[in-house]
């Protein structure tokens, strides 16, 4: 028989940050995992003098990778070669090997990680899970192959997820829809444990400013622990959340100002003549946020022309007459890539005296 004692739990990141919230971890004084601010320009002045200010609250709910094949591992140990081999549905076999070496006190030559076809990864399979080390230890002890395949129910409660952010944001514009300032607060639900630090909300807080000209910006970010599955990168790694917040704010402003949604974006996009454009922010690799090339207004115009944006209202009305409802939306997204600064090299010296550099 198993006796269960119900314990207090928090499932809402906002409630988790309340002073009287039950701590997720025993001995912890609160559930605030981390907090930071991002800012440039004078937001107070921008909002104090702005003809228009639009405020919105967003909850971006949780989601997961939910690949066709769940996670799985097979571990074997060859005592003759003193070689531990782990076949794992991991997206990061080199990281997994290094972690196994660190945890088991083994040299890299004594650990091999093989990543076969994954059946879908999408981010959650970047993570090193307890099952990875558990199977490795079991194979070393038993001297037998050990296999574990995650079922779908386990996947929903044991594999990391993403999103789950609460935004309170406001945008200041002039009478023509030009952005004067952006500010707000972001609460990020981190789940019960941390596997990737602050990188997800950090990316969200950077991406919300792209690819528009924003003279002043301020965002307060808090990471909350909750009694939920941990949060790690999934398909975009924090960046879609920032895009969603900005694009919805622009839709709201366009509606209130009587502007076409595409036009308000065109008026605020960074122009090709201003490239490369350095944003006064720091990416998570420590370098500056640089929009290195492109003509964003032209890119938007080309896409809208191919999509038939100007002709869509006529199509919409024709469909409405037939009892059908058609809608169209748009968004601009600049994907951050090439982050650093980090490189690696391996030098191997064989007994024969030859040197191999990788």
What is each of the regions a protein language model found here?
Residues 1-358:
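Structural alpha/beta core scaffold segments of enzyme domains
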